[in-house]
Amino acid sequence: MVLLLSMISRCLILIILCYQRYISVFLSPRCRFYPTCSHYAVDALYTFGLLKGLLLIAKRILKCHPFHSGGLNSISIKTKSKREY
């Protein structure tokens, strides 16, 4: 089970990296946050694994609306814990 979740996490990271390299370059910069949502997603998946990473990604995307000011929102060292697959 752990191996399967790790493989899924790596596949998602690969998809996001392909998006960054081949699709994102044609879009104008729109992200309200630093790092961008795609960089945040890769960092969350790499640091926390699939389950907690997806939860953090969902929370980040839900913050992306005109009424949120954006700003610096990275995965801090304090929030890093053991990787949960």
Curated annotation (Swiss-Prot):
Primary location class: membrane
Pfam families: YidD
Residues annotated as signal peptide: none
Similarity comment: family membership: Belongs to the UPF0161 family.
Membrane topology: Peripheral membrane protein
Presence of keyword Protein biosynthesis: no
Keyword Cell membrane listed: yes
InterPro entries: Membr_insert_effic_factor_YidD
Phylogenetic classification of the source organism: Bacteria, Pseudomonadati, Pseudomonadota, Gammaproteobacteria, Enterobacterales
Name this protein carries in UniProt: Putative membrane protein insertion efficiency factor
UniProtKB keywords: Cell membrane, Membrane
Superkingdom in the source lineage: Bacteria
PANTHER family: MEMBRANE PROTEIN INSERTION EFFICIENCY FACTOR-RELATED (PTHR33383:SF1)
Protein task: Could be involved in insertion of integral membrane proteins into the membrane.
A cellular component term, taken from the record's GO annotations: plasma membrane
UniProt-annotated location(s): Cell membrane
NCBIfam families: membrane protein insertion efficiency factor YidD (TIGR00278)
